[in-house]
Amino acid sequence: HVLSRRQRQMCIRDRVYRSLPEKWDIILSPDNPSYKDLPGVWVLIGGLWIAHFAYWGFNQYITQRALGAKSLPEAQKGVMFAAYLKIIMPLVIVLPGICAAVLFPLLETSDKAYPMMMSLLPNGLLGLTFAALIAAIVSSLASMTNSISTIFTMDVYRAYATNNPSNTRLVNIGRSTSVIALIIAVFSATPLLGSLESAFQYIQNFTGFFTPGILVIFLVALFWPKATTLSVLNAALTSLVLSIFIFYFFPDYPFIHRMAVVFFSSFFVCYLTSLIQGYTDSPKAINLKDINFATSKAFNINTAVVVVAVSYTHLTLPTT
């Protein structure tokens, strides 16, 4: 008897479910031990969207890749290629995690799943996977250090320098900043992340202190002409102070919920500050009429393909 594709999927799902029934949950209930990290349906309709737009839309770590393109069409091609890569993320991240949970159910921490799965690969494929991992790490470090050096050199050093520094001086300052940042990262990695069950969750929690304010700043700067310098500064301070307050005084409150609360609070503070200052259009406001938001026909078609592919994946995956 030859099983159909759907039947094979059901058989695999049933075997995995019987092996670890307690892990077969997509939407967690409030009594689940992991609810603090993945608070049920709010993961899909709550604060996760704030982290999403802040990272993919306004993080220099991402946007500098598009800004480095030689033309707008080339930048759009890069963004679209990244969208196609995101479609296969379940195969790259989720599927190996499910396999690790079945093959190694007694792992002490989730971070050990990846090296354990790597140990199952044959020599040739292991080397290829390791090379890809190193390339990804180097690429991420390059983008991160470039962001750090650019922000410090152009927005801090040059802005407050007593004299007019030359380009050579700025380049040297940027390089020194990158080296110092990497040294700090090396010596702080183990104390900050070494004892954690999941470094990824910690990083998301920590960056959640800043992302709501960053998102508010960029949104009002782009689409609200009445925003002022003081209003966005107050929004940034509200984001940091309120995040720290909730983190320490309500430690069991899910950080995704916290990001949503902080985002709307920061936006309200920004609005209130602008209202107190007179609620008039800022002379530095961006004129959106001068900006061309048009996209090419190929970009629109590929966008539709990505949306259909994601929708099809969710509709056809086996569910419990």
Task: Cite the ranges covered by each PLM segment.
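Terminal cytosolic tails of multi-pass membrane transporters
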Residues: 14-15, 253-315
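Central hydrophobic cores of alpha-helical transmembrane segments
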Residues: 231-242
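Hydrophobic alpha-helical segments and their helix-loop junctions in multi-pass secondary transporters
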Residues: 5-9, 13-29, 53, 98-103, ...
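Helix-loop-helix junctions that connect adjacent transmembrane helices in secondary transporters/permeases
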Residues: 55, 61-205, 300, 311-315
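Single conserved hydrophobic/aromatic residue that forms the stacking wall/gate
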Residues: 1-8, 12, 314-320
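Membrane-interfacial loop-to-helix junctions in multi-pass transporters
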Residues: 36-41, 119-129, 208-213
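Membrane-helix interface "capping/anchor" motifs
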Residues: 222-233
